[in-house]
Amino acid sequence: MKVLHFYKTFGPEQFGGVEMFIRHLTHATSDLGCENTVLSLADEPLPPQQTPSVRMFQARQNFNVASTGFSWSVFADFARLAQEADVIHYHFPWPFMDLVHLAKGLNKPSVVTYHSDIVRQKVLLQVYRPLMHAFLGRVDAIAATSPNYLQSSSVLRRYRHKAQSIPIGLDQSLYPVADAEQVEQLRDRYGGRFFLFVGVQRYYKGLHFLLKAMQSAPWPLLIVGVGPMEQELMRMAERLQLSNVHFLGRVDEQEKINLMQACYSVVFPSHLRSEAFGIGLLEGAMLGKPLICCEIGTGTSFINQHASTGIVVPPMDADALHRAMKTLWDDPALAQRYGEAARARYLDVFTAQGLGQAYSALYREVVSRPSA
């Protein structure tokens, strides 16, 4: 089975949520006999690359508007690669992708992973909506990343007849193994126990509520990652005199796993539906950490089951975040039970092996349908 993935960004050094999803999915499906190709855009395209699980092609991005990359050359690249493929796998949202599909889709069997609604660009959404529905109406199957998102998305409501939920899964073997000595050094450096946030510092991550929750808190918080909100959040922490909040900036995968292993709990305060899933939260579950997140009707509270794997609180509620952190901090036995349950839930629901099997079955199903 030859599969062409199409998304706006993908490369060896990119670790955004969708890119990580594609990386873990292609690794899993290649073990099941799929030949995966990924086509994406880049300001400075790399030459084609081949790894054991995927071929990578990049077309030159000519310009970018509202997080949407455009490329004139990708039409020809897409048509050529689509001709070779048995099925095309799109990753939504990316409005330019819809245009390419409608122009060059070649009536190939097609699958869309619906990663997120378009939340912030409401004016542009009004212009884009007809193209979006033309695209979603033409594809053969749609997969949401959690049943929560499938049920709560007003866009997906129109496509229930061809939509299903396939949860994101992670392959732990693709991560480095935590360095035990460095893990102990981290615990010593930050007082033995600390809360951890890992992610890009974007507007929907709820980090300003987390900083408010840290006022008068006795426990340390480490914030890992960079992003457009970073400087504003650092100024806020300074203004609130939060000496127990530490911004670590960008870290590599080894450092991230060391921090995850060392931490007491993973806290994930995203407060808007732009946070469709939460890879950082799932990584915490994979490593057996108790979880804290907000109920926003998306995959965050599908990963984190309230009073089982951790605590789920209302969004935009700093007091509720503080109380959740205090509950775990004051009760190590409860935190340990939640962490063990989070690890068990990862193994039961969120492995890359399960992800690969589900998508391989979906590919076979759409390819076997009679042509329209």
Segments (PLM) and residue ranges:
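N-terminal strand-loop element at the rim of the active site
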Residues: F6-G16, M20-G69
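A conserved mid-protein helix/loop that constitutes part of the nucleotide-sugar donor-binding site
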Residues: M20, R193-S216, P228-M234, D319, ...
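Donor nucleotide-sugar binding/catalytic pocket of nucleotide-sugar-dependent glycosyltransferases
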Residues: S40, M132-E181, G192, F247
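Acidic donor-binding loop of glycosyltransferase active sites
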Residues: D86, F195, Q261-A276, K289
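Short His-centered aromatic/hydrophobic patch
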Residues: Y90-M97
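Nucleotide-activated donor-binding/catalytic signature segment of Leloir-type glycosyltransferases, i.e.
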Residues: M234-Q254
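Short hydrophobic beta-strand element within catalytic cores of glycosyltransferases
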Residues: M286-C294
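Conserved acidic donor-binding segment of nucleotide-sugar-dependent glycosyltransferases
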Residues: Q305-A318, M325-P332
